Every structure is written in C-alpha cells, then in structure tokens.
Amino acid sequence: MGARLRSAHDKSGPELMKTSLRVLAAAVGFFALGLQFYVIAAPLEGAELTKWVIEYFCFFTILTNCLAALAMALPVMAPRSALGRFFDRPSVRTAIASYIVIVAAVYHLILRKYWDPKGWALVADVLLHYATPAMFVLDWLVFVPKGQVPWRTVVTSLAFPLVYVAWTLVHGAQTNWYPYPFVDVATLGLEQVLMNVAGLLVVFLAVTAALTGAN
C-alpha cells in the first residue's frame, strides 16, 4: 500500500508541474492574442474593423500563437477529445515548437526594427514573441516524451508554412497588402519573395530537424 502511494505521488509531481505550466501558458497566450487584437481594433469601426479582423489572422505570429495556446489548453481541458489527443502528440508539439522558435527568432533578428510598440501594445508584443515561445519550448524540453518524434515530422511540419505562404501570396495579390516586408511582392517582386520564402523553408527544415534529433 505504501509503495503504491509513493508511486502515485512520484507520478503526480511531474504531472502537476506539466498541468500548471500548460494552464499558465494557455492563459498567457490567449490573453496576449486578445490584447494584440484589441489594441489595434479599439479605435476602428465598420469596414476598417472588418479589414483588421482579416489582417489579424494573416500574421504567422498570430496563427502560431493560436496553435501554441490550443496545444497548451486542449490536452489539459479535453485530454480525451480528438483535438486534445492531436495536440498532445509529440510530433505535433515538435512542429509547433519549431514554428514558435522561428517566430521569436525572425521577430528579434529581422522584424523588431519595423515596430516600436508602446503601452499595452508592448505588453502584447513581449508576450507573443518572447514569453509564449519560451514557455512552449520549456514544455517541449521537459514534458514531450523522448524518442517519439519520427523523422518524417521534418517534412510534414512544412504543411502549415506552405499553406500560409500560399494564402499570403494569393491574399496579397488581391489586396496589395502583405503582413511582412520579406513577402511584399509589390515592393520586392515575386522572384525575390520566392527566394526569401525558400530560405525560410530551409530554416524551418533545419529547426525541425534539430528538435527531432534532440528528441
């Protein structure tokens, strides 16, 4: 009896830590997403507000943070649901980890100079580009089971970035608006944008391969 209790206690410690981290990360993630939407949307009305709703979901940062928040929340809130099981897969969490690492790196190294947020916008910026990535990577390092990420994840993880690029180029061609300067066809031309995209896809492959190998 005592041995069983000790075993249960040993298991409950790491499980409690995992649950606590995921609840905190999900709360921070959803708060940051809502705050980022609000600080831009607050003064807008009518067509401008509708336009912002569409543009909000055109940012890779926003979409990736949505995935990260869902991946933290659903395995805790609905662990037996199809989505809860999906987001708890080691391969899925590894793919999202690679996306969120690239979000943080690209923002810090390339995009930060284009954006100077103040006040609540700065809070949202720090949470989306630094806090959420750090918590998700910490969760991946500590709680994703080792040796369970197949190498095909390196290739399959490209599906989301490829769909995103396709949508960005199609939407941009219709609206002449692009969410990031390195995919701005109107300014750079299609050839340069495709070269930029190819370079980023190589980075995605490299980061996912590194994470898969580390697992």
Over which residues does each language-model region extend?
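Membrane-helix exit/interface motif
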Residues: 42, 71-81, 102-117, 138-145
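Hydrophobic cores of alpha-helical transmembrane segments in multi-pass inner/ER membrane proteins
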Residues: 61-75, 131-141, 196-211
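N-terminal membrane topogenic signal
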Residues: 10-26
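Membrane-interface transmembrane-helix boundary segments in multi-pass integral membrane proteins
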Residues: 17-18, 58, 175-210
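Juxtamembrane non-transmembrane "cap" segments at the membrane-aqueous interface
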Residues: 159-178
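Interfacial segments of alpha-helical transmembrane regions
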Residues: 83-99, 150-158
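Alpha-helical transmembrane segments of multi-pass membrane proteins
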Residues: 27-44
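Non-cytosolic membrane-interface motifs at loop->transmembrane helix junctions
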Residues: 48-57, 88-89, 115-128, 151-155, ...
